[in-house]
Amino acid sequence: RVAQANPKTGGIDPEEIRRVVDKDTCLLSVMYASNITGTIMDMEGIVRAAREINPDIYIVTDAVQHAPHAPMDVDKLGFDGVNFAPYKFFGTRGMGYGYVSDRVAKLPHRKVLQRPEEIWELGSPTPGNFAAMSAVVDYVCWLGGHFTKETDRRKLFLVGMEHIHLQERALLYTMLEGTDKAAGLRHIPGVHVYVDTEDLTHRDLIVAMGIDDVDMTKCVEEYQKRGVTVFERVNSSVYSKRIVEGVGLTGAIRVSPMHCHTVEDIEEYLRVTKELAEEFAK
């Protein structure tokens, strides 16, 4: 069974989870945030809705998109599994990380016979991958140290992630509304922000947009010629089809800056967007 996206928000509503989950449903898998619309799911509401129907249901979340943008409390939310990818926040490709709850850790699985039942590791991992991930954590803790006098690494990490989220929300607002030097996406003729919502507290720093009468691939190429990197997400891709069509589109241009971008970077992107919209309108 597949839960359908809300075309107005680009997310999955708890009510939709109630529709597809029953007392015999074993597993619910849900993305923490959409990598196309940037919508952060109401995970508390989704978990609560599922467990009201089946208290024993296993719930896992794909947090590849959301993990680099805000802290997650897996214990509070009651997840049984979480996965994320270090390449999304300056780490190495070729490796992913996961979390499993105590009850999942003890499920039957392939393991070295003499190891404890909750150990899933097989063989020797690549030290370089862990070194790269450790450097990411060091960086976030360094950021957190600018906003607190705490020395505990977990507290530093949480503060760092919270400020990353706030910084990105400010950049998202700038993209949408602009500055006195560059008009925002909401105010450029011929430009459309898809699945746009006023409440930015439930959005990661991602915008799905389009320009009137312009092929997505052609538009991406024109951005690249001007030094701006964006990507097309179209329904011909198996990775994009469900959510793109779920919000009533055939494709969108995905714009996804990060906290380290500046207001000046956003202004340059907005100026290029306005320039392209005017050129294509001729």
Question: Could you tell me what each predicted segment is?
Answer:
Residues 1-282:
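Pyridoxal 5′-phosphate
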